[in-house]
A protein has these predicted regions:
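Short, well-formed alpha-helical segments that are part of the catalytic scaffolds
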Residues: 12-26
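Acidic helix N-cap motif at the loop->helix transition within catalytic regions
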Residues: 15-18, 43-52, 95
């Protein structure tokens, strides 16, 4: 029986990576498990935190602050054909690993992921309303928005040599698989803590939008495998007037992200603006350089 290799790129994630590792180790799996954390360009205590799990977690360190580089380094260390890739700030439910692995019993499945659970822990009623509306959108409910965790089989991994230098590495992988080859596994979760402030939300949405533009330009051949995020949204809203109060902020965030991302894309300004509101102080910042925009 083949095992599962999990690769976790981590850039200055000392505040959250232990929580993520504990959630993985709380899972039971019917096969060998290899956990690899690639600490890339860290200036905090990420590596030291990971060493606290030394008996069960392999640590790879690189001075290059690049998520793409970290993913490729992790892939070189991985020893199993079944691979999973996990963001360092994501929590898995205790049945996620087995449930996702079981999805590959279907020979047509090439990529599997748990249902994403997007949580907002702040107290701003406007942001709470925004997330309520966003989570209710058809494309989100269908699982189009990933939860920072996905697993792939050997066949899908064979469709590319190395991870390309893209902001939207997760969407690249998702679109590499045809819709009928993807599986969102119900009954298990990957918990994503959403930005707690409007400023951080705008940064993250701009990054997502930039990543979509970049992927579409670099790999237009994958557009056919993408999902129309706007399909059914208007009719859904028209029939639910109790959501209308949240529409103005929703539209503002969408328009802001579109304009900001398109401007930066036109100027070839690669970005990686992550949400710092869900990471306790001290905060870290990354300059808008080709290396920094790929930092995990």
């Amino acid at each position: 029986m083949s095992g599962l290799s999990i690769i976790i790129p981590a850039h200055n994630e000392a505040a959250v990576v232990a929580r993520t590792l504990r959630s993985i180790l709380a899972n039971k799996l019917d096969r060998p498990l290899q956990i690899i954390v690639v600490a890339n360009g860290c200036t905090d205590q990420t590596a030291e935190v990971v060493r606290g799990f030394a008996e069960k977690v392999e640590l790879v360190e690189t001075p290059v602050g690049s998520k793409t580089h970290a993913l490729n380094l992790g892939d070189r260390v991985a020893k199993y054909d079944l691979r999973a890739y996990l963001d360092a700030d994501i929590e898995l439910s205790d049945n996620a690993l087995q449930s996702v692995v079981d999805a590959f019993k279907d020979p047509t499945v090439r990529l599997a992921m748990p249902r994403a659970k997007h949580t907002y822990r702040g107290r701003n009623p406007l942001l709470a309303g925004y997330y309520h509306l966003w989570r209710s959108m058809p494309y989100v409910r269908k699982g189009a928005m990933g939860g920072g965790f996905y697993a792939i089989d050997k066949e899908l991994r064979g469709r590319f040599r190395e991870f390309p230098s893209l902001t939207a590495d997760d969407k690249f992988m998702r679109n590499l698989a045809k819709p009928q080859e993807r599986r969102v596994v119900e009954g298990c979760f990957a918990t994503v803590t959403m930005p707690q402030s409007l400023g951080d939300l705008l940064k993250v949405k701009t990054r997502w939008t930039y990543g979509n533009l970049e992927l579409s330009a670099v790999r237009p051949d994958l557009n056919a495998n993408d999902q129309n995020r706007h399909e059914g949204a208007l009719s859904y809203l028209i029939l639910r007037p109790w959501l209308w109060f949240n529409v103005p902020l929703f539209v503002f965030v969408y328009v802001y992200a579109q304009l900001a991302a398109r401007k930066r894309f036109a100027l070839k300004q690669a970005i990686w603006e992550r949400d710092e509101s869900t990471r306790p102080f001290p905060r870290t910042t990354a300059a808008a350089t080709p290396a920094a925009h790929q930092a995990a």
